[in-house]
Amino acid sequence: MSEIKLIVGLGNPGDKYTDTRHNAGEWLIERLARRFNVSLNPESKFFGKTARTLVNGKEVRLLVPTTFMNLSGKAVGALASFYRIKPEEILVIHDELDLPPGTAKLKQGGGHGGHNGLKDIVAQLGNNNNFYRLRIGIGHPGHRDLVAGYVLNKPSPADRDALEKVLDEATDCVEMIFRDGMVKATNRLNSFKI
């Protein structure tokens, strides 16, 4: 199994989007940066904010694209190409409509499920979808016509509380990947309930 060398948190740039559901991936990267005691700094050649850290003696890069969500692949592709990071060495963290708030799932590969950030990353990695995903449940508004407005709005206080709890657990589980391996971290995160 490949080691994770790049962890990407998806979101939209700008204060207006900071607290919206679509930025759940970025929220987790910010927690990881605090956990690993590093700062995310703008790096224009990677179209995002990046940090480099050592986790259990292994070099890992954190990335938050500063492009809009549907262009996330531009940042991921640029950094992965520059550092010769393979798709299977990448973990992408993103919001997931098909999971309820307070849940998260880790998996490798799969489709994009209509998520425009994932769609662009797959395209920019040469149509390779073999990267890992950490999907943070944000719930579904009930009808597909409501999705765009839903993901670009703030979660309710109850949902935000559930998200905070699962983000704490996910932070521990990402760190666990480097200590105990992907299988143990996946089993722990995928069975988490609040």
Swiss-Prot record:
TRNA binds at residues 17, 68, 70, 116. It is found in: Cytoplasm. One of its GO terms (biological process) is rescue of stalled ribosome. The keyword tRNA processing does not apply. InterPro entries: Pept_tRNA_hydro (IPR001328), Pept_tRNA_hydro_CS (IPR018171), Pept_tRNA_hydro_sf (IPR036416). The record marks 95 as: Stabilizes the basic form of H active site to accept a proton. It comes from the Bacteria. SUPFAM superfamilies: Peptidyl-tRNA hydrolase-like (SSF53178). PROSITE patterns: PEPT_TRNA_HYDROL_1, PEPT_TRNA_HYDROL_2. Its EC number is 3.1.1.29. Its main location: cytoplasm. Keywords: Cytoplasm, Hydrolase, RNA-binding, tRNA-binding. The keyword tRNA-binding applies. Pfam families: Pept_tRNA_hydro. It catalyses: an N-acyl-L-alpha-aminoacyl-tRNA + H2O = an N-acyl-L-amino acid + a tRNA + H(+). GO terms for cellular component: cytoplasm. The active site is at 22 (proton acceptor). The record marks 12 as: Discriminates between blocked and unblocked aminoacyl-tRNA. GO terms for molecular function: peptidyl-tRNA hydrolase activity; tRNA binding. Belongs to the PTH family. Monomer. HAMAP family: Pept_tRNA_hydro_bact. Hydrolyzes ribosome-free peptidyl-tRNAs (with 1 or more amino acids incorporated), which drop off the ribosome during protein synthesis, or as a result of ribosome stalling. Catalyzes the release of premature peptidyl moieties from peptidyl-tRNA molecules trapped in stalled 50S ribosomal subunits, and thus maintains levels of free tRNAs and 50S ribosomes. This is Peptidyl-tRNA hydrolase. It comes from Haemophilus influenzae (strain ATCC 51907 / DSM 11121 / KW20 / Rd).
